[in-house]
């Protein structure tokens, strides 16, 4: 049975940690789903990790729909959440509704994720949730605001910490079913987690969040530059390189294919 946003709320009350990872294709999505991952996020980070862009900004809605549909075809149980990419929801609630509607109708994903917690974004979230579109929030470091905020840790001083807290509370009141807390001090994340009735999903936000999310390529050691808050559990880049070298050597020495 597929996981629902309501189950995540139950797990928050039960203090059961939630596991989330990213996927952009059917193969990886099916592995994550079979391994018991509860949330599979089709993140616009695919622009940087899979498509070679320097930021997430060039990623289009059509690209996200293409990859989310591929992910959903490989998933039976996990909750699939799709990032709405840059400038596909910020203009107005009507624009956001059109983008979110396309995602849900064309991919089968169960929810969308929006970045930011300023008043207009809170209004947009409220409009989406009013019509039954499940929304995941995202505050702290928001990659779509890279040219304004950069990639540094957010919420380090009392004023910005208070701002992030108030944004998280406002988003929860607007109806998000969960919220990503990215690259903020662990004390701030713990405070937000304690005050919100919805699950917090941390990435570089300490261990006290209700769940954790990582970019799967970072987890597996596929990326060239590892984020400071994302330790690699495997050096898959090295493993793939060695495997390709072995295959190449056998081809060049005419040892492949082996005579059976």
From Swiss-Prot:
Spell out the GO cellular component terms annotated for this protein, sorted alphabetically and separated by semicolons: cytoplasm
Keywords from UniProt, A to Z, are: Cytoplasm, Magnesium, Metal-binding, Pantothenate biosynthesis, Transferase
One example GO MF annotation: 3-methyl-2-oxobutanoate hydroxymethyltransferase activity
Q: Which residues form the active site?
A: 182 (proton acceptor)
Cofactor binding annotation: Binds 1 Mg(2+) ion per subunit.
**Where in or outside the cell?**
Cytoplasm
Assembly: Homodecamer; pentamer of dimers.
UniProt name for this protein? 3-methyl-2-oxobutanoate hydroxymethyltransferase
Source organism (scientific name): Synechocystis sp. (strain ATCC 27184 / PCC 6803 / Kazusa)
Upper lineage ranks? Answer: Bacteria, Bacillati, Cyanobacteriota, Cyanophyceae, Synechococcales
């Amino acid at each position: 049975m597929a996981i629902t946003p309501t189950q995540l709320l139950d797990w928050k009350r039960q203090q059961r940690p939630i596991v989330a990872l990213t996927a952009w294709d059917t193969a990886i999505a099916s592995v994550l789903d079979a391994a018991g991952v509860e949330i599979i996020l089709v993140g616009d980070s695919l622009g940087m990790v899979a498509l070679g862009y320097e930021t997430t900004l060039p990623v289009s809605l059509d690209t996200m729909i293409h990859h989310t549909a591929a992910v959903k075809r490989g998933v039976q149980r996990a909750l699939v959440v799709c990032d709405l990419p840059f400038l596909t929801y910020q203009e107005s609630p009507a624009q956001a509704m059109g983008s979110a509607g396309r995602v849900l109708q064309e991919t089968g994903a169960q929810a969308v994720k929006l970045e930011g917690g300023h008043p207009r974004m809170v209004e947009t979230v409220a409009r989406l949730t009013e019509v039954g579109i499940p929304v995941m929030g995202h505050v702290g470091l928001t990659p779509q605001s890279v040219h304004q905020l950069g990639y540094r840790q957010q919420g380090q001083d009392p004023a910005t910490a208070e701002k992030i807290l108030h944004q998280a509370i406002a988003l929860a009141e607007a109806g998000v079913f969960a919220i990503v807390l990215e690259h903020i001090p662990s004390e701030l994340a713990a405070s937000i987690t304690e005050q919100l009735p919805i699950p917090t999903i941390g990435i570089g936000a300490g261990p006290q969040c209700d769940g954790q999310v990582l970019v799967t390529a970072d987890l597996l050691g596929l990326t060239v530059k590892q984020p400071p808050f994302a330790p690699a559990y495997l050096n898959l880049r090295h493993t793939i390189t060695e495997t390709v070298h072995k295959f190449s050597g056998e081809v060049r020495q005419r040892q492949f294919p082996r005579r059976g």
